[in-house]
């Protein structure tokens, strides 16, 4: 008589991912997004209009594009506070070019090159000179925007070609804007880069312990330089979009964008201390920020109230993980 073997219970690898997915930060963000969407739909009769929802996407995509690259930079343990100033400088250079008769391809190229150049400048100061990124980018924030103010003064550049307007005002299909399409494509690219490549694994390793990563053969300085370049490039892309959408260039353009970008990143679950985060969370946080600010706009809430909200939200999302870790340590002690 043979013994019947007891059935094996092997759902650990299946159950844990399901459980962690249900109780993950991203799942909480989905619930918050749905709740805000519902509140907005009840608060304003215009919110659920298809074209109104399309306008919503213009409210956050330019900042969200920068947030994708900023997420990788913060995960690596660095930060860039100059992104809004990069937009201003790139937009100013495009304005000068259009006054000289440049066409649409040249304008796009100038925006991207200026953004990439500014990001590379930040990266060199941080990686080659060993300066703290927060200090460097506070300095370049003033530098880049100051140059824009010197060039423009109180005037504004206008007269952009009609073909240039597509990037910030055009639609790919029905109410689906070009800006939203570009953001979704970029989100997929950055998700793959961070979560499915060796480059992404190195970014996490650097954020967790840069010294250990260096000893294990990771070229820390090179990767951080690339991340600063990517952040500058995304700011350059955002400058093309916002300049195209507004149809003009002013030195005050995109003022305050850097705080909204960082809020999106941290709200998305990226640790401000580095070493943890996900692109999915950043995408969800971008939609939440867009829903909140657009909903407040429909209710004619003053802009200063939106600024107060963003400031409070940034403090809360930075403080919560730190307080939570402190509580856990006290419980384990």
Protein language model regions, located:
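Short loop segments and helix-boundary regions at transmembrane helix junctions
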Residues: 14-20, 79, 99, 116-159, ...
């Amino acid at each position: 008589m043979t013994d019947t073997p007891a059935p094996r219970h092997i759902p650990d690898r299946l159950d844990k991912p399901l459980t962690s997915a249900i109780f993950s930060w991203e799942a909480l963000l989905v619930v918050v997004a749905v709740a805000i969407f519902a509140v907005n739909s009840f608060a304003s009769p215009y919110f659920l209009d298809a074209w109104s929802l399309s306008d919503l996407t213009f409210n956050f995509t330019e900042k969200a594009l920068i947030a994708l690259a900023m997420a990788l930079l913060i995960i690596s343990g660095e930060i860039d506070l100059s992104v809004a100033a990069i937009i201003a400088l790139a937009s100013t250079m495009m304005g000068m070019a259009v006054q000289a008769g440049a066409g649409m391809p040249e304008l796009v190229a100038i925006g991207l090159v200026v953004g990439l150049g500014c990001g590379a400048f930040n990266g060199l100061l941080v990686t080659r000179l060993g300066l703290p990124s927060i200090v460097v980018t506070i300095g370049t924030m003033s530098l880049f925007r100051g140059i824009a103010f010197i060039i423009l003064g109180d005037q504004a550049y206008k007269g952009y070609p009609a073909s240039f307007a597509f990037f910030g005002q055009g639609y790919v299909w029905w109410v689906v804007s070009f800006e939203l399409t570009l953001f979704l494509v970029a989100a997929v690219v950055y998700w793959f880069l961070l979560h499915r490549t060796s480059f992404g694994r190195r970014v996490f390793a650097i954020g967790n312990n840069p010294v250990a990563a260096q000893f294990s053969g990771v070229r820390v300085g090179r990767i951080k330089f690339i991340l600063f370049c990517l952040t500058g490039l995304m700011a350059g892309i955002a400058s093309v979009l916002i300049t195209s959408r507004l149809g003009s260039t002013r030195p005050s353009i995109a003022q305050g964008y850097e705080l909204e970008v960082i809020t999106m990143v941290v709200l998305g679950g990226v640790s401000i201390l580095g070493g943890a985060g996900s692109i999915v969370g950043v995408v969800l946080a971008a939609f939440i920020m867009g829903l909140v600010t657009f909903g407040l706009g429909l209710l004619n809430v003053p802009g200063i109230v939106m600024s107060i909200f963003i400031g409070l939200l940034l403090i809360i999302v930075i403080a919560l993980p730190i307080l939570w870790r402190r509580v856990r340590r006290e419980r384990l002690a």
